[in-house]
């Protein structure tokens, strides 16, 4: 551990990734003070996959766009590093993404600079480079798309650019991590969505040919990468190598897209004898029709959209050589073990 790391402030620490960030800092940096800033408190009941004591974690409830709220948390935590993992879920209105991902991040950067925080680690997304086309072994030299596919990744890219622009080796050092396809214990979006679709009888349908490799990443590995980044960005021997850089974070073992979903469904007892396969062009057409009808006639969110079809059917895997070399990152939990942990957590019924 870097001797400089004494205190970490985790923005969004009550969320899915946030709880795993607390856990990994607790495990790997036992002498580091951990503070959480979030709009919601830490959960009262935790899965067995979390060993930290919530009562030992200093907590601040606040608004990321409030100078005062952020200043209070930074001043009282006396943090060396801020880990900013707060972000709304997919599928929400654009104004929410703008407020949290863009305005909130810019406010956090401004306050951190004024209060002389040493470093900030930002949780970006591998989706910031996705334009609907195949992403094959992409590295950090790939550009942002001219037109983003969705509001979430558009604002994550804008926030990432702001974080990179704020990097100053004489003041606030910054680094961005781009995890892909996060899953694991505590997930409240991917797994619940899969379970809901199975209950509606949708597990028998397959969009695309399932020949597309996809990066699923175990959440504990993503949290490990953040701990490494926080340590490296304070270490005098490594900080110049990672300051102002972006890093893809994956399990380094892309698998066919539907593998994870069918493993979850099988655990729940949904074992389909056959699949109704919708070729990509057909699925995409249905996506456009569904989106039009839902928004213009039914006045509700569509169940299937062109964006979702493209995400499901595209090849999307990334090269993590840079993270291995400069962060010393390697996925400690393999894909099969991560899926088993997730299934075990699902059966806890928390």
From Swiss-Prot:
Induction, per UniProt: Expression is repressed by amphotericin B and caspofungin. Expression is also repressed during biofilm formation.
Gene Ontology MF term list: 3-beta-hydroxysteroid dehydrogenase (NAD+)/C4-decarboxylase activity; 3-beta-hydroxysteroid dehydrogenase [NAD(P)+]/C4-decarboxylase activity
Membrane-topology annotation of the record: Peripheral membrane protein
GO CC terms, sorted: endoplasmic reticulum; endoplasmic reticulum membrane
Binding residue positions for substrate: 125, 152
Alphabetically ordered keywords of this record: Endoplasmic reticulum, Lipid biosynthesis, Lipid metabolism, Membrane, NAD, NADP, Oxidoreductase, Steroid biosynthesis, Steroid metabolism, Sterol biosynthesis, Sterol metabolism
Coiled coil, from the record: none
Catalytic activity: 4beta-methylzymosterol-4alpha-carboxylate + NADP(+) = 3-dehydro-4-methylzymosterol + CO2 + NADPH
Binding site for NADP(+): 12-18, 63-64, 85-87, 152, 156, 179-182
Subcellular location: Endoplasmic reticulum membrane
Assembly: Heterotetramer of ERG25, ERG26, ERG27 and ERG28. ERG28 acts as a scaffold to tether ERG27 and other 4,4-demethylation-related enzymes, forming a demethylation enzyme complex, in the endoplasmic reticulum.
Protein name, UniProt field: Sterol-4-alpha-carboxylate 3-dehydrogenase ERG26, decarboxylating
Organism of this sequence: Candida albicans (strain SC5314 / ATCC MYA-2876) (Yeast)
């Amino acid at each position: 551990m870097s001797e400089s790391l004494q205190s970490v402030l985790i923005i969004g620490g009550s969320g899915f990734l946030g709880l795993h960030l607390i856990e990994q800092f607790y495990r790997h940096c036992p002498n580091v003070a951990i503070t959480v800033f979030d709009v919601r408190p830490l959960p009262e009941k935790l899965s067995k996959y979390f060993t930290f004591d919530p009562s030992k974690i200093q907590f601040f409830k606040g608004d990321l766009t409030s100078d005062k709220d952020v200043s209070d948390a930074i001043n009282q935590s006396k943090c060396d590093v801020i880990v900013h993992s707060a972000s709304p879920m997919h599928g929400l209105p654009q104004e929410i993404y703008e407020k949290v991902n863009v305005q909130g991040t810019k406010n956090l950067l401004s306050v951190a600079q004024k209060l002389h925080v040493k470093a900030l680690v930002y949780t970006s997304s591998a989706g910031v480079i996705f334009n609907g086309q195949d992403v094959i072994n992409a590295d950090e030299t790939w550009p942002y798309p001219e037109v983003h596919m969705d509001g979430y990744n558009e604002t994550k890219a804008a926030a990432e650019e702001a974080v990179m622009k704020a990097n100053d080796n004489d003041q606030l050092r910054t680094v961005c991590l781009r995890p892909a396809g996060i899953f694991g214990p505590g997930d409240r979006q991917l797994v619940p969505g899969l379970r809901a679709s199975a209950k509606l009888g949708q597990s028998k349908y397959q969009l695309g040919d399932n020949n597309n490799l996809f990066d699923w990443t175990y959440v504990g590995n993503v949290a490990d990468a953040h701990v490494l980044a926080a340590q490296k960005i304070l270490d005098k021997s490594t900080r110049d190598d990672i300051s102002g850089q972006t890093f893809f974070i994956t399990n380094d073992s892309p698998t066919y897209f539907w593998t994870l979903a069918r493993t979850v469904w099988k655990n729940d007892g949904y074992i389909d004898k056959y699949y109704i396969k919708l070729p990509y062009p057909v699925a995409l057409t249905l996506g456009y029709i569904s989106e039009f009808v839902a928004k213009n006639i039914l006045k509700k969110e569509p169940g299937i959209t062109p964006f979702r079809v493209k995400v499901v059917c595209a090849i999307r895997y990334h090269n993590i050589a840079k993270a291995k070399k400069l962060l010393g990152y390697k996925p400690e939990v393999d894909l099969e073990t991560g899926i088993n942990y997730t299934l075990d957590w699902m059966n806890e019924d928390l």
